[in-house]
Amino acid sequence: MKLNLQKPLVIFDLETTGLDLVKDRIIQISYIKVYPDGKETRGNEIINPEKPISADITALTGFSNEDVKDKPTFKNIASKLNEEFKGCDFAGFNSNHFDIPLLAEEFLRAGI
């Protein structure tokens, strides 16, 4: 199916330390960026959330504190993601109620 896009579309999903938009942090962001000409690029970042990952979240996401200890923080990759996402529309499961607001919070904390 060909999409009729006016600007790039980022379809993305987050794994996080919980469901609190203010207190919780991103552990992983995976995305596909679809351009109006049909070209696609993909990205996947595992992120050190700078807070402990609970056993419940490890069971849910598969990510442990050990997995993220040497990964970059969101602040370390925020500029790169900002450039990648600039001018794009966004889509994803439950993205308007959770993923987009949490991503916006992370960008604000990073000073972007």
Q: For each predicted feature, which ranges?
A:
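Conserved non-catalytic scaffold segment of RNase H-like nuclease domains
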Residues: 1-112
